Amino acid sequence: MVVELKNIEKIYENGFHALKGVNLELKKGDILGVIGYSGAGKSTLIRLINCLERPSSGEVLVNGVNLLKLKPKELQKARQKIGMIFQHFNLLSAKNVFENVAFALEIARWEKNKIKSRVHELLELVGLEDKMHFYPKQLSGGQKQRVAIARSLANCPDLLLCDEATSALDSKTTHSILTLLSGIQKKLDLSIVFITHEIEVVKELCNQMCVISSGEIVERGSVEEIFANPKHAVTKELLGIRNEHADKKSQDVYRIVFLGEHLDEPIISNLIKRFKIDVSIISGNIEELTTKDIGYLVVRFLGNTAETQRALEYLNALGLQVEKLKD
């Protein structure tokens, strides 16, 4: 495991219980999206991974090493293998792009003759080799974040922490940054933890996700699994799943999830013909994830109980996930 958080508790001096019994693992090469509402504990969690925050109790292991047991110099060295980017970039305004990236190497005591070539390599990686003499005030938000990404990768980390790294960007720039991170992850075989409150970020970038609410991890799994079958109420809210279509006049309203090959099959049409039952399609959409597409339909079966039951058994036999929406 690249990251292991074990039985983490975080209680601040004012008594606020920010994290409660958190256990979390990150495998090599995974991109984990940590999503939740404001105040849920997301930023506290990510800052524990590189010990910018220290837990009240529990263990923080990165590549098998308990960071909480390291001496200050040992911790400083370990942090060099953990890159981090933030919402507001944290660039040095008095230094140009080249100098901002080089600064991370100078702190790590790289040899001067190696710094120049490394900075050029990093700026080429993030597409800013033509901006090396620009200052932060001359850059767009997306360009500033690209500089921050280059700086975070300076010391060849195997883990990248992203704390709301796209929250200050517009949707087009967000897409470009996520595309960049996805490409970098593949090229460098990075593991990434990405804190966000935007479900679109998780859909576009991540293969794993966890949902945090009131300091607790309430759901954890692959993005595909959770989008297909969310369990917790907070997860359903974040995914935009509501029960407004279910009412007391009609209890036969269902949400059907279509995965992979089923997306192109005329399943509802076949069901209608086979069981002579009317189906009212209330809503539908397709989510494009990093691993595969997932389709959703909210339908009402307009038949008697026996007909509806046969239709449900047919859908279940096909391996579809069917959830009855409650009022």
Curated annotation (Swiss-Prot):
Reaction catalysed by this enzyme: L-methionine(out) + ATP + H2O = L-methionine(in) + ADP + phosphate + H(+); D-methionine(out) + ATP + H2O = D-methionine(in) + ADP + phosphate + H(+)
GO MF: ABC-type D-methionine transporter activity; ATP binding; ATP hydrolysis activity
The ABC transporter domain, residue ranges: 3-239
Coiled coil segments of this chain: none
Keyword Chaperone recorded: no
Subunit structure: The complex is composed of two ATP-binding proteins (MetN), two transmembrane proteins (MetI) and a solute-binding protein (MetQ).
UniProt: ATP binding residues: G36, Y37, S38, G39, A40, G41, K42, S43
Bilayer topology annotation: Peripheral membrane protein
SUPFAM superfamilies, per the entry: ACT-like, P-loop containing nucleoside triphosphate hydrolases
InterPro entries noted in UniProt: AAA+_ATPase (IPR003593), ABC_transporter-like_ATP-bd (IPR003439), ABC_transporter-like_CS (IPR017871), ACT-like_dom_sf (IPR045865), MetN_ABC (IPR041701), MetN_ABC_transporter-like (IPR050086), NIL_domain (IPR018449), P-loop_NTPase (IPR027417)
Compartment list: Cell inner membrane
Enzyme Commission identifier(s): 7.4.2.11
CDD domains: ABC_MetN_methionine_transporter
Protein known as: Methionine import ATP-binding protein MetN
Family matches, as PROSITE patterns: ABC_TRANSPORTER_1 (PS00211), ABC_TRANSPORTER_2 (PS50893), METN (PS51264)
Gene Ontology terms: cellular component: plasma membrane
Function as written in the Swiss-Prot or TrEMBL entry: Part of the ABC transporter complex MetNIQ involved in methionine import. Responsible for energy coupling to the transport system.
Organism for this UniProt entry: Helicobacter pylori (strain ATCC 700392 / 26695)
Transmembrane stretches, start-end: none
Family: Belongs to the ABC transporter superfamily. Methionine importer (TC 3.A.1.24) family.
Keywords: Amino-acid transport, ATP-binding, Cell inner membrane, Cell membrane, Membrane, Nucleotide-binding, Translocase, Transport
Top-level EC class as recorded in UniProt: translocase
